[in-house]
Amino acid sequence: NCATVGGSVFGRFGFSDVLTILMALGARVELYHAGVMPLADFCESHISRDILTKVIVPKGVTGAVYLSQRNNATDFPLLACAIVRREEEYRVAVGARPMVARTYSDERGLLAGGITREIAQAFALELSQRVKLGGNALGSEESRRALCPVLVRRGLLKLEGVE
């Protein structure tokens, strides 16, 4: 068995590690008939009778981190989190919610003054309240709700090298 980037993207699988990081990176897709569009728009569309020809990853990333929690090493993720920094702007994608990944930004500007443990915790708690989560066979909504701020906080601290 093997997975491909194109298959993961076109399938829009909620458990896709690849889709989560590409969403955080702000990737775009090119489809033979529909043309170029943001990956986030493609994931929300119902396009099924087309051909994915390219995945376009924009330049300018100054840092990125991906974290996930799995019940065991070979499982699909219970929850996935990718954080990308461009200049001083952060973009967070949360995947395996169990729905397809969705991106979030620092709407309240909590990260504008730099990352400390306290700021990372405050942002993680605030963001986790905005994330729509659900349950499935891998885990409950409650377990994902408890895990989300942990992954976001750890990701921010790792990205910025804060110990």
Name the predicted role of every residue range:
Residues 1-163:
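C-terminal structural segment of proteins
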